[in-house]
A protein has these predicted regions:
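Leucine-biased recognition of intrinsically disordered, low-complexity hydrophobic segments
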Residues: 11, 15-17
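Predominantly soluble domains enriched in secretory-pathway, periplasmic, or organellar proteins
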Residues: 17, 21-337
């Protein structure tokens, strides 16, 4: 039974790599220019480890032991810790994003598959992919207290919180739904049917649209959430296994990984059209973009490698061997989201 649960998890990934809340609140986009490069973190879900990579030498400098099945990670609002969610050990590992030293482990957080802070920095939210609920925690700047556990649907996968910290959106991977939670009242506002196996999702800057990647299909669905009725306004064909999003950092484009097609599509958020494609082998999954916008880091899930793509030439420039089933990818030296 554990094998079956794990297999379902490997169909989900999020673009969880950095806190949009921290960026909005502090005005920062990672380490300061001129400082030593921050390490690059790659979560190895089947090794229960995090690979730490020196981006000046492209060597793995160490491998951090975490809890069971780390999938996603997220920066705290004060940027002092990056939190690794260990789904099968019900724990969170806090790591210094600059030194890669483990700071502490928080236990008793049930099945934290995906995680996110609200932009107002008051709430910390986790999706329990295996246990079919979403937990909402109060965040006091260093610790979390459970405020509400909300039963959702089958396999809540990824999370997105709007810029006003009023609505939490989540995909239901195995019931093919998009749901919205009212954060002030901590109740479900609505749910709509989606295409097959919705995974990652993201909102537009004006909070009017939600993009949903269909891992069981070959497209990104666009939902208009600005009015009283939620409508699917467009379907953007990207590639088989559309999975995770990463904003390019230019305020206009977003990337989506297509895990089965072994490609990454570039979407223009103004026209909602695909305007480019990158070839990335090995089942591209989670992504991060360097602060200068020149390179894309991609976890190649089935190849046990980190792939590095030159965004100017569109070419794969290197692959770095990491652990089993690499998933979340993140660095403090990231481009804006």
């Amino acid at each position: 039974m554990i094998f079956v649960i794990s297999a379902f998890r490997f169909l989900s990934c999020a673009l969880v790599l950095v806190s949009a809340a921290a960026t909005a609140a502090t005005g920062t986009t990672g380490a300061k220019p001129g400082s030593a490069p921050a390490p690059l973190f790659v979560l190895n879900s089947l090794d229960d480890t995090v690979s730490v990579i020196d981006v000046t030498t492209w060597k793995e400098t160490r491998r951090i032991a975490t809890g069971k099945q780390p999938h996603h990670l997220y920066l705290t609002p004060d940027e002092k810790s990056v939190i690794v969610a260990n789904a099968l050990s019900d724990s969170l590992t806090f790591i210094d994003p600059r030194t890669a030293e483990v700071q502490r482990t928080v236990r008793g957080v049930l099945d934290p598959y995906h995680l996110r802070f609200s932009p107002d920095m008051k709430w910390f939210v986790t999706a329990a992919n295996r246990l079919n609920h979403i937990d909402i925690f109060r965040w006091d700047g260093s610790n979390m207290t459970l405020a509400k556990r909300i039963a959702t649907g089958k396999t809540p996968s990824h999370l997105w919180i709007d810029s006003k910290s009023s609505t939490v959106y989540s995909t239901m991977q195995d019931s093919d739904e998009l749901i919205a939670l009212d954060l002030p009242t901590q109740t479900i506002k609505w749910r709509v049917k989606t295409g097959p196996m919705p995974a990652d999702l993201m909102g537009t800057a004006d909070d009017k649209r939600i993009l949903v990647a269909l891992t069981g299909g070959d497209a990104v669905e666009v939902y208009d959430v600005s009015g009283p009725a939620v409508t699917r306004s467009k379907v953007i064909k990207t590639g088989l296994g559309a999975h995770a999003f990463r904003a390019l950092g230019d305020g206009r484009h977003v990337l989506v990984s297509n895990r089965v097609a072994n490609t990454v599509s570039k979407i223009d958020l103004q026209t909602l059209d695909v305007v480019g494609r990158l070839d990335v082998p090995g089942g591209p999954d989670c992504m991060d973009v360097t602060r200068d916008g020149k390179h894309l880091y991609v976890s190649s899930r089935w190849a046990r490698k980190l792939s590095v793509v030159d965004l100017t030439s569109g070419k794969l420039v290197r692959q770095v061997k990491v652990g089993k089933s690499p998933h979340g990818v993140w660095t403090l030296d990231h481009a804006p989201r």
